[in-house]
């Protein structure tokens, strides 16, 4: 008889006895309680922090405390967000003593109003204050996602216009063609921009694709020259804006043929590549994105076709240098995204009941008699006999099919959650 196997227990039993029980989410308190996190992280170059729902107060707080630990104790230098790379530049400027208020830069730099809450403001403010007082290299805060809330390439095209005029005026015609088409369907609301693109004629759609390809090819050909002139960083940034615009064009085309579920994974390719390009020189990165985006494993759409999240790309590129920490909860409230309103043009986030943990969900295994719990799934696996049974995890107000022990290296479980101060309560009746 295998003695080791006979001594195995359930994950619920292991979590109750061995997972790290934590009793504070206060971002101001010392992070000594998170010292066991060091074993989860190891020498990883990228640590991803998830969330099962957006606009959850406690999830922002969990991320803030873990970010502090990774920065203060492990030397991480970049906080990369599920936010547009192009518009997110204002965040990086602000945390390094740039102008403006935290409320304004968070609203401008983070799509879908995910920056419009006190908890995100507190994280950005902590980063700025640390940069003003610490002798260490400055913390950076960068977006990783497609431009225009993954709806319009216009912000990226406008961002590179000045560089194109200076470095490659002969490419202005291609830029102007792309801008002229982008303006025809531009809208800050993602779903509106997606619909307007579909109303373009095939000739206009082809013109946009052609112009973007010509522009990218022409600028890429100048890379060596621009670097020799000392403009390498500016050139690389301009190319990254354009790459986001190009991927977004591909998303629009795929949306018409495959549907948005599949097309949206162009976001994930770009998010993963945006993180990987930050790793030069040994930089370590914390990525904050939804649990779906950070999972290590491929997913599938409703027809069974493969979907590749950003985490799958990062795991393939980095192997053991990538860690995915899912963040979820068992009790309390969650949020759902409703239709845009004049006051909430990017969509209104509404409070919603949190269904009880489903059978076979990872949430069902966690104790709820503490504020939150951090469980190292990799450490647990040799000691449990039911890892393969956990095939579900929360996504907003429902449960997603996901092989939890393959998808995540650790789980941060908050016992009870609430919406942020930006979340609305639906009117009765």
Give the label of every model feature segment.
Residues 1-429:
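Structured catalytic-domain cores with a bias toward divalent-metal coordination
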């Amino acid at each position: 008889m295998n003695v080791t196997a006979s001594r195995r227990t359930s994950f619920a039993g292991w979590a109750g006895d061995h997972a790290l029980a934590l009793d504070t989410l206060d971002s101001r308190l010392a992070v000594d309680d998170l010292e066991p996190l060091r074993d989860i992280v190891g020498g990883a170059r990228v640590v991803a922090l998830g969330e099962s729902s957006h606009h959850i107060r406690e999830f922002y707080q969990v991320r803030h405390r873990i970010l502090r630990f990774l920065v203060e104790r492990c030397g991480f230098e970049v906080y990369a967000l599920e936010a547009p790379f192009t518009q997110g530049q204002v965040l990086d400027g602000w945390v390094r003593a740039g102008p403006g208020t935290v409320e304004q830069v968070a609203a401008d730099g983070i799509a879908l109003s995910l920056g419009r809450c006190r908890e995100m403001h507190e994280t950005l403010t902590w980063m700025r204050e640390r940069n003003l007082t610490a002798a260490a290299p400055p913390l950076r805060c960068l977006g990783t996602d497609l431009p225009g809330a993954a709806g319009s390439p216009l912000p990226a095209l406008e961002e590179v216009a000045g560089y194109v005029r200076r470095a490659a005026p002969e490419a202005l015609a291609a830029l102007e063609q792309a801008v002229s088409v982008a303006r025809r369907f531009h809208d800050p609301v993602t779903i509106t921009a997606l619909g307007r693109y579909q109303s373009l004629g095939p000739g206009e759609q082809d013109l946009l694709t052609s112009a973007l390809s010509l522009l990218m090819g022409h600028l890429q050909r100048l890379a060596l020259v621009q670097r020799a002139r000392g403009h390498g960083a500016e050139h690389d940034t301009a190319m990254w804006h354009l790459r986001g615009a190009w991927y977004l064009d591909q998303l629009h085309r795929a949306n018409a043929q495959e549907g948005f579920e599949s097309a949206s994974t162009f976001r994930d390719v770009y998010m993963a590549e945006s993180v990987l390009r930050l790793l030069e020189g040994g930089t370590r990165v914390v990525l904050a994105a939804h649990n779906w985006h950070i999972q290590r494993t491929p997913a599938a759409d409703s027809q069974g076709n493969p979907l590749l999240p950003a985490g799958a790309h990062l795991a393939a590129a980095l192997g053991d240098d990538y860690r995915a920490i899912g963040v979820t909860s068992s009790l309390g409230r969650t949020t759902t995204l409703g239709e845009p309103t004049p006051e909430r043009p990017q969509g209104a986030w509404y409070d919603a009941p949190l269904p009880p943990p489903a059978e076979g969900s990872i949430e069902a295994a966690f104790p709820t008699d503490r504020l939150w719990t951090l469980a190292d799934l990799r450490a647990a696996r040799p000691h449990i006999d039911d890892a393969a049974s956990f095939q579900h995890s929360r996504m907003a107000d429902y449960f997603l099919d996901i092989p939890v022990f393959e998808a995540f290296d650790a789980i941060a479980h908050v016992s009870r959650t609430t919406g942020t101060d930006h979340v609305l309560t639906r009117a009765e009746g």
